[in-house]
Amino acid sequence: VLIGLAMSRTADALINAIDSGLRTLFATPHASRALDLPTDNPPLNAAQQRDSASLMRVNHVGEVCAQGLYAAQALGARVFYKDEALAGHLEAASVEENDHLAWTSERLHELNGRPSLLNPVWYAGSFAMGLLAARLGKRVSLGFVVATEQQVEAHLASHMTRLDPSDTRSNAIVAHMKQDEARHAKRAQAAGGMTLPQPVQAAMRGAAKIMTTVAQRI
């Protein structure tokens, strides 16, 4: 009976992870929080609009990756070490990341931009990395969240220097996302996340650089 119950819970966790992936890639995201955006965004010229759309596409890809990461790590928390509290912690962060997905998706549409054509690849890669981190243990898994969120926070800060100041809506979205990412990193650290070795963090930055460079164009 216990074995059957464990298998049932594992199957449920797998189904939830698959459902999360399908919704991320193919459904229209809906935010759980309303974002108070400026309504007086002045018209952007063609170059400004193109640049903003390019940066917002990169941010949208980052949120697709976040969904893959958190889905995999929540799955790992349930399957590898049966920790519902940790899985719940990760899923709560995922809900806020889904808000980011919705905000960037909507802004991309407003800018007449399109999502990256490689979103399924980005999601799959992030899911695989998240599952690997989870397999290495709770502290590594949470440490991976800390490092990821800190790098995303720095990335968003750089976008705030690159977005045209007149694009007040995009700037407001990025600023709010940056605040959320900083909070997610602190929570994961407080929950026991370890500091990852510098070579690992450097490899993560390298992978992120490839993703952002490609996503700006494709």
Model segments located where?
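Non-heme di-metal
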Residues: 2-218
